[in-house]
Amino acid sequence: MLPFKLWVDADALPKILREVILRASDRYQLEVIFVANQNVGITPSVRIKSLQVLSGADQADQEIVNRMSENDIVITQDIPLAAQVIEKGGIAIHPRGEVYTTANVKARLHLRDFMDTLRGAGVQTGGPPPISERDKREFSSALDQTILKQKRKTA
């Protein structure tokens, strides 16, 4: 197995992306841990694990941050979690394929705070559209590129 792990913030992960993650685990012999506050319906194996945490805001996020190591990869759409992952030396990937960086995560945090302010004022902001086949391909490509980059870095 590789010297780094793939952590999945599974509470909000679109189900369409699970197969991409499981295929990557097989292809690269990569350990994957799905973390959620509910059963995610993943069959455990040698490389695939599921970790159920207590219900509550940010419980899964905190568990990931506490358990992850430098160079680990985390899949999340949670901006504060992505910021913590980067701060701890990991790599965070959005389910639509964007790899978070120190610069873009700060911009995303500001935008998130602004949208929270709008929602607090009663403005309906709507949510993101469902994951498309194009998003799935972009996520798969970003995940493969990130795994290969980490393989070279940790070799």
Curated annotation (Swiss-Prot):
Disulfides per UniProt: none
Region of interest called Disordered, as start-end residue ranges on this chain: 120-155
One matching Pfam family: DUF188
Domain of life where this protein originates: Bacteria
NCBIfam families: PRK00124.1 (NF001095)
Similarity field: Belongs to the UPF0178 family.
Protein's name in the database: UPF0178 protein A1S_2615
